[in-house]
Amino acid sequence: MKRTLLLLPAIACLSLSVFAQVPVDKTISLQSVEIQGKRFGGLTGGEVKRLQVDSNLSGLTGTTADVFRLLPSVVTDIEGGITFRGSNNPGLLINGVPYGLLEEYSGDMLIQLPALFFDRVSMTSTPSIGLVPDGDAGILNLSSVVYTAADSPLVLTLGAGFQERYNAGAILNLHPGKFHIVGKYNYRREFRKRTFSKSTTNKGGTTVMNNNASARPDVHLADLSVGYDLTANDLITVYGLYNLMDYSRYGKIHNNKLVDGNLQPVMFRHRYNDQRQEAYAAEARWYHTFDNPKDRLDVVFNYNNFGYDEDNEYKNEKPETGKIIAEDNYYVNQDKNNYYLSVLYGKLFADDWHLRVGYIGRFKDESYHAYGNKLAAGEWQSDPQKENEYNFNRRTNLLLAALEKKWGGFCAEAGVQGELNWQKIDTRYQTDDVLEKIPMVKSTSRFHLFPRLKLGYRTDKAGELALSYVQRVIRPYGSYLNVFTDRSDATHVWKGNPDLKDEMIHSVELSYSYATSAFRFSPSLYYRNKKNRIMDKVLDEGENGTIWTKENIGHSQTFGFELSATWQPIRMLSLGLSGDIYRDEIDGRTIGYDRKKSMVCGDIKGSVNICITPTTELQLDGFYISDQLTPQGKIKHRSSVNAGISQYFMHRKLRANLSINNIFNGLEETTIVDTKDLQMTQVRNRDAQVTWVTLTYNL
């Protein structure tokens, strides 16, 4: 509590803006949305807020999860989970396209992905109609800077940090003739330590589980973009992406039971875990502009694959003797194939009428295979209860249309996305009390309209008022619908729910933005109404422990107020503040909960940026997030303060950067479950207190 009280005034005097010596006008875009805004060294404001990673001194040496925390109302936890305006399910895109590696394993990816690779992160609560309607509070998009012939043809990066951390990268930028070639590669290696503890009390008594684990992830990431100016009005681009994360992990799980007031060890379970996550993508884009530059046709086709392989070896040790009393293993193979096609056409008519129409198609095919063995009487035997074969298919076809009208300082847009969605699950699994495998085949289809409306008024040259309504959806990932119980990680046993329904969200926002060359002020009021809200729930399985699952937690609504302000009083100093406060309400009485729950939650964050000399820059930033509501309890507050300093050499061709993350080690996450029959306290933490030194050279 004392640490919290000390952090609040410290963070309150910080700012959200990222350092820039000279603020400049900047046109920002996310897919087909273009917003004119003022840029404070990396953070661009407006309907779409975009952060330039290499302008952020504490984030550029970190990961994408670290950088997300610098955006207004966006917070990430120690495992890469994202909270945006109180929602844990924002849409995640790469260059406006959904990817398989940004689904249920996105946390693993975000805490390993070097921040400098996708060096622009964007956020918007009112996405363009040309984007998929998935995501609760809005979307977060990863993209790269558009390199031109005026930029450096070669950029080299080399970094090292405490606890055996290393990073190296290169960017190649060439523009021969009509070609535009940009290739990037980054390698990152770390040695990570994690701690975990869980105390569970139910009718059977109290048990305590502790686990200290270490991991060595190796991450390779590369992409290549080749553009060609076919004509003065046509640009064709092909793009490829490859990502490999491979690591080994060891954990020793201590299982204890409270007997007569004394905590007695029951068993030590050793886990030797190897994981390999591999993703690749191939993409083609065609941009065509007509005689009127506002008339354009955009076509995008993307195929991306994500593979997940996990090998587990277990040994159970008797604490009293140190002897191994049981051995078993467990293997998981998962493969995802994603196809995406979008065709968007925009036409500007007389009197400032603008029409946009298009099609978006998404096709998913996933397979999941699990199996395991156990050592019995000195021989390895297959364990039928660990076997699972699961296939998931989804077909989503979406037609869209939007009409916009501008007159004077007013503008209005009305649009709709009409979607036909079909999906099928096909699984074979075995329960504890049935000897043969149980088949389950289930298919569903639906048609749904996603309407939207936006009204805007420009009050003067610097101010704009907007009122918007949009309907969005959260679709369960394929693995969330698999009824099989995954016991690969004893600290987090997981079971899918084949009866999960899509979560539907109605969002209304009233926002105002005021921007000059040195000051930006942006307050927003928002409201979200959710039907079939998807949230985590823990099940009490008695002597078998607890099992996590996903469930539709009835009706829910959120009222919130967001405020961000940035100010550059003098050339060498940039200040600001961002805060978000909201009332989160969960009404689960329709599914058996005894009462409606609510909590006032919020976060505050910011940074201060100083140009000490023309070649020396300093940044401090931090955030604090309050307790968060869950269906069965809460997640306790957490915070982080970071610092970064850069020194330029050789006429700014060489930069040395020192960053320190999570200075006060405040990211520890405590989850509390408090129900009539189950009380649980779970604490997770990892060594996020990291110091990095990075050298960047521009040819």
Q: PLM ranges: what are they?
A:
Residues T64, L70, P98-S125:
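Short acidic/polar hinge/loop motifs at secondary-structure boundaries
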